[in-house]
Structure formats: C-alpha cells, structure tokens
C-alpha cells in the first residue's frame, strides 16, 4: 500500500475506534513508538516492536478510569509520513477528568507503519 492508502485505512478504522485492528493490519512487526520526553513522568515510555507497543497501550488503558469521548482528524500526507490530530476526554485513575490533545506522526515504509511519534 502507498502512504495515502495506509493513511486512508488508518482513518477509516480510527473513526470507529478500531485501534487494535489498526495495529494488526497496518503496523510492521518491528515498528517503534516514540513519546515526548515529558511523558515519562506520566508513566509513558518509548517502545520497540509490536509486543512492546501493545503492552504500552494496555498499560495506558489500565490508567484510564473512564473514557468520555475522543477524536481523530483526517490524515495529512507528506512523502512517507502522515499525521493526525487526536484527543480524548477521559478520567485517569487518581488524577481526575482531563482533555488530552496531541499530534501523531506516522512513517510508512513498504506499505506498513514503521514509526509512530506523539507530540503533546
């Protein structure tokens, strides 16, 4: 798939909250996930490989007490990259309710996402 095709499929699945399917279908086995440096204070770290990325997602989900809503914008494509705006309204365990917004940038090689990087 081209970057545009990967981005379109990502968007279709994201609009219905199918994050597991996105990872299963669109990610390379050796993909990496990069968080901003300040995310470590929130218990979020970088991950390499799909097993580690899935565990990172599970750990984040365990921190969520209640999800009130969320969004993912349409992708913007540039070369082998696409980016989306994302956000969620959630109550984190022991931290109360908050609105989180970020930009996510994805790198595509040989029809698969090989890197995700988050900015917030």
Model-identified regions with their sequence ranges:
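Short beta-strand segments enriched in hydrophobic/aromatic residues
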Residues: 27, 88-90, 104, 120
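A solvent-exposed, acidic/Ser-Thr-rich amphipathic alpha-helical stretch
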Residues: 24-73, 77
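Short beta-strand edge/turn micro-motifs at domain boundaries
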Residues: 101-120
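Short acidic-aromatic low-complexity motifs
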Residues: 1-32
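Short, surface-exposed coil-to-beta transition loops
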Residues: 68-71, 85, 97-104
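Short, cysteine-centered beta-strand-loop-beta hairpins and adjacent loop/turn segments enriched
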Residues: 63, 90-98
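Short, acidic, Ser/Thr-enriched surface-loop or helix-capping motifs
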Residues: 28, 93, 108
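A short hydrophobic beta-strand element
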Residues: 77-88
